[in-house]
Amino acid sequence: MIGQKTLYSFFSPTPTGKRTTRSPEPVPGSGVAAEIGGDAVASPAKKARVEQNEQGSPLSAEQLVRIQRNKAAALLRLAARNVPAGFGESWKQQLCGEFGKPYFVKLMGFVAEERNHHKVYPPPEQVFTWTQMCDIRDVKVVILGQDPYHGPNQAHGLCFSVQRPVPPPPSLENIFKELSTDIDGFVHPGHGDLSGWARQGVLLLNAVLTVRAHQANSHKERGWEQFTDAVVSWLNQNLSGLVFLLWGSYAQKKGSVIDRKRHHVLQTAHPSPLSVHRGFLGCRHFSKANELLQKSGKKPINWKEL
């Protein structure tokens, strides 16, 4: 649409060709600055206002409010144009303020460039699967991961989860092993798709949401961590009685901001084969989470529903 920049226009190369210059003379009575070689020359009307302010006539409170309002509206318009594909509506309403921020615009440009030159997981329509499973206000349990799986057909926007018919990776196998001793009647589902939990209000959130194929942590420190911190912060501040399951030092560090008077936090070792015997097996986090949810008046999770 003419007059509206798209997200990717911020990252397009500067076109080459004839260089045009504008007349140094402002349009009479327009109050619009003319540009000469990139430098703005203020109109007489604008100069008068600037000089007046410099002489000790500050902007009125009403003018300051109007300026702030206009800036906020501009950010919202930019954010609305930058909504990523597949972002759930209720999540968008609460998190859209992030979309117009410079770090997020830069992040989206980086991911787009990566997709142009490399295989990136998960595919664009699945990066935000975690926002499509339930309303943001229906979240009950939060499990924090780190980085998406980087093999073919594995990652689909839910941490620890893999698409069918891909077999469960070792960490997920250990999660199922703990469930089989913690939850009565739990039987290995024969697949690794955890969408059944997500639909019940279990947020399965990685700190970083994309990865280059076969290169673990290749998209770390590009902006995803700041965005997912904003997600955790919103949940922490706006909901109550959530159960956060923090497995391993990385998740525990990311969850250090959680208000433990407002929410419940369960911590143990990561389910990776390297650390599973340091406390994950036998932690009983799944039954404990349900007990805490019931104390908060919430419906427990059916961990067998996969």
Swiss-Prot record:
GO cellular component labels: mitochondrion; nucleoplasm; nucleus
GO biological process: base-excision repair, AP site formation via deaminated base removal; DNA repair; isotype switching; somatic hypermutation of immunoglobulin genes; somatic recombination of immunoglobulin gene segments
Region (Interaction with RPA2): 66-81
Annotated site location: Essential for recruitment to S-phase replication foci: 10-11
Name of the protein: Uracil-DNA glycosylase
HAMAP family the record matches: UDG (MF_00148)
Pfam families in the cross-refs: UDG
PANTHER family: URACIL-DNA GLYCOSYLASE
GO molecular function, one term: ribosomal small subunit binding
